[in-house]
């Protein structure tokens, strides 16, 4: 299985720079996207590759964070952030394929303020790592 992860720093900007032409050449089974910075209503058919199942998890705030997954095979299950208190930032989307889980995650920046660094570390140690062990 070929899995690619990429921070697109804005899916619309990436599209203008040839992202989808590049993607077609990769022959990926799953593509994890971080920092899509778009709401689904801002995305037309160009952002839904015809040969893949598309799952976006947008932040409520326009132009901010967000994650996505493109999957060749339809996952058995999709989960959009199991933690409701951070769901509004669109930071996690998970695809389950039998015993395999693929997670696209965009962690909070730890460089902006001490409070955000503490949030990032708490998220990793208290939430995400236990989630991975399940």
What do the PLM-derived regions correspond to, one by one?
Residues 15-16, 88, 128:
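Amphipathic coiled-coil/heptad-repeat helices and related helical stalk/stem segments
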Residues 6-13, 80-82, 119-122:
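Short, flexible loop segments at the rims of nucleotide/cofactor-binding pockets, characterized by
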Residues 1-47, 64:
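N-terminal, active-site-proximal structural segment of metallo-dependent hydrolase catalytic domains
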Residues 36-37, 43-112:
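Structured beta-strand-rich core segments of catalytic domains in phosphoester-bond hydrolases
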Residues 117-134:
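A long, amphipathic alpha-helix that forms part
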Residues 20-23, 112, 117:
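Alpha-helix termini
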């Amino acid at each position: 299985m070929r899995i690619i992860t990429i921070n697109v720093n804005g899916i619309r900007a990436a599209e203008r720079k040839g992202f989808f032409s590049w993607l077609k050449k990769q022959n990926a089974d799953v593509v994890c996207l971080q920092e899509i910075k778009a709401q689904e209503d801002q995305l037309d058919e160009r952002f839904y590759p015809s040969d893949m199942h598309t799952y976006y998890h947008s932040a409520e705030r326009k132009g901010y964070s967000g994650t996505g997954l493109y999957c060749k095979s339809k996952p058995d299950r999709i989960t959009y952030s199991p933690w409701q208190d951070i769901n509004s930032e669109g930071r996690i989307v998970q695809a389950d394929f039998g015993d395999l889980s693929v997670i696209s995650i965009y962690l909070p920046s730890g460089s902006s303020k001490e409070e955000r660094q503490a949030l990032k570390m708490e998220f990793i140690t208290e939430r995400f790592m236990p989630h991975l062990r399940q």
